[in-house]
Amino acid sequence: MKKALKKSLYTAVLSTVMAMSITGYALAAEDFDDAEDMEFTLDSMVVTASRIPTKITDAKADISVITRKDIEQMHISSVEEALRTVPGVQFLNYGGNGGMNANMSGLRINGSKEIVVLVDGVRVNEFQGSDSGYFYAALTNNMDNVERVEVLRGSAGTLYGSGAKGGVINIITRKVNETKTSIDVSSGNFSTREYKLNTMGRQGKLGYNVYYDDKHSGDFKDGSGIEWKSDIDSTSAGLKLNYDITDNHKLTLSYDKTKAEFSGYDYIYHNNYSGHHDSYSLTFKDDITLSDKWSNSFTYRRSSTEGEYAQNNHSLFNADLSYTYDFISDQVTYLTNRHNVVFGVDYAAGKDDDAKEFTAHSGKYEHFKMKNTSYYVQDDWEIIPHVTLSGGLRHDRPSNSGQTGASIETHTSKSYKLSWDVTKKDNIYAGRSGFFILPSIYQITNKQYGNASLKPAFGRTSTIGYSRSFDDYNIFTFNWFETKTERGIGLTAAGYVNTKGLSRGWNAQFMTQLGEHWNANLGWSHLYQYEDEDTYSMGYSPKNLATFAVYYDYAKVKAGLDGYYFVRRVNDDYPDGWPVDNYAIFNMSASYAPTKNISIYAKANNIFDKMYSERTHVIYASGKPGDWYSMPGRSFVLGMQVNF
């Protein structure tokens, strides 16, 4: 069974990390130019909760924000690094093994790997199903181009479609309203080096943004001093053009490409591995404001992904995959004093470029393709002053072709929520939201583990929330949730099967400004989770996860300290499955700006050199203590950024 799961996981990584798609509505973030503006206050806007710009205190949702200031304070280099201190977010990473990791590896929100990732409101994962929470996209590598990252916890299936069970991550890029070029060079231990270029400018109605990132890392040591062989070279590049036809009519064209090559040694299977994964996406958007009440957003995206993973002596683990996707979305927004209405249609089509004709144990396939058309509507209605009733519907009509087997059923997801502004500072809400998850192309067509009869997953999440705004700079939120998976998708030795599951827990966070130069974010998440027939999940869930971040900013000096404390929910069947069940990770960063245009920085990750792991092989029959993929130990980076 372990080989079956391992093989499927290797292939799923390549098939899902690079899946890219869309969802219609995108809003550019406000551009912040000075330190005072970068502070996140109650007046700051978020868009992910309702697809409409809303103050964070009016969102009535379990949401967190990583701001531009947070990114700069900690010199955060990737979206994964930014998300590791967000309440309710978990990663299952293969240490520094490049062929088994992605930009965001094994990502979970509220215990679920079924999430939606957006860039400027546009999906970058589609037809992923319930694979492994892996995402691969160029824009997740270069944080110089990112204004903020919004994390919405909880099911959002009616607004964002298939896959939005655990939550939604929206990466919002910087708006082009100035001319600026940034060059960043850094180097550290583990043969780490990175070169980044980001340039933007505006000439009249035309704005542009170009970015390039080149990154290398080599062998690394874990917290116990053991060296792991690894070599990773990756590049990401992109171009975004904005053209303002009028103040109310804007066009955007963007192209993003990423390429990675990797090799190393798998100490669990005692074998060399090598491979690559490449992807690109081309996106066109047309946003128009028709009046003070009506607006429309149209999006088209084409993306292509290709990858290969190979182990020298284990052909069972080899994978060679290539997918192409097309996406069209149109959303209409209607706003009045008492109603915020969004409605629209999303269309997605994907095909397996390598699957010309073959017979798997689950069926016969020829030029396999998947399609899905979704129609949705949501209304936030202030029924009386301070009381809002929200309701939404999404109808999915999926289909596939080139398959001898069961057809995929249609589904309608529903959501509703009632919120009450008890006082000017206190808000409570309660609601329920359904989700619907299509199987991925890989889960259906894989020659060894695919299942032609695999049905979509569906279920619902119930939530109760409370928020307290002490003042403009101090916010507390608490959210309880329960997710019932009436039909899920799990992996066994025999292949993919439909399952059932339950997760329940809560998230709490406190965001505060400590005087003129300090600010902090604190979080605490608690989780119970169970899913039958999914042996892969055993022992991976956290029982409690505490997160923290403290930042200091004064004159030419910036500094930050962040991290998390992980308490594992131990599986009694595998008491020795991990090097440690409870651990704390601390990271720190400091920078000094001798001039306005130059910044010299240093950062240290895992500063106490903690030995820990997020992936284990011990739970399998042949596993033994020590058969886990260790995370890197203490690492250092020294860099310089020049702006002109």
Predicted regions and their residues:
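Short acidic/polar hinge/loop motifs at secondary-structure boundaries
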Residues: 106, 123-153
